[in-house]
Amino acid sequence: MSFKPLHDRIAIKPIEHEEKTKGGIIIPDTAKEKPMQGEIVAVGNGIRNKKGEIHPLELKIGDKVLYGKWAGTEIEIKGEKLIVMKETDVFGIIN
């Protein structure tokens, strides 16, 4: 991938949910919930504080995270769908 987020932003590859219910019913795209879990694939350098020092991000590439349903902006790079958001939009890391 050739995308580098700036400042305190991160790029997340959403983890897709099943397209069928346990009973075998196929869920159409229009009825699917937006995924709220994903894996971080790129991170910015951090945010600059009032003293001009860069504070690095806590999240790192490979972390699996939980984020808000409407967080971030969806983009597509080389056919790969990503969500770009600020680190503060992430609720936490999934272990």
Curated annotation (Swiss-Prot):
Coiled-coil features, chain-numbered ranges: none
GO BP term, example: chaperone cofactor-dependent protein refolding
Keyword Chaperone: yes
Keywords associated with the record: Chaperone, Cytoplasm
Subcellular location: Cytoplasm
PROSITE patterns: CHAPERONINS_CPN10
CC terms in the record's Gene Ontology section: cytoplasm
Matches recorded under Pfam families: Cpn10
Keyword tRNA-binding applies: no
GO molecular function: ATP binding; metal ion binding; protein folding chaperone; protein-folding chaperone binding; unfolded protein binding
Cited function: Together with the chaperonin GroEL, plays an essential role in assisting protein folding. The GroEL-GroES system forms a nano-cage that allows encapsulation of the non-native substrate proteins and provides a physical environment optimized to promote and accelerate protein folding. GroES binds to the apical surface of the GroEL ring, thereby capping the opening of the GroEL channel.
Family: Belongs to the GroES chaperonin family.
Oligomer status and interactors: Heptamer of 7 subunits arranged in a ring. Interacts with the chaperonin GroEL.
Listed PANTHER family: 10 KDA HEAT SHOCK PROTEIN, 20 KDA CHAPERONIN, CHLOROPLASTIC
Identification of the protein by name: Co-chaperonin GroES
Origin species: Rickettsia felis (strain ATCC VR-1525 / URRWXCal2) (Rickettsia azadi)
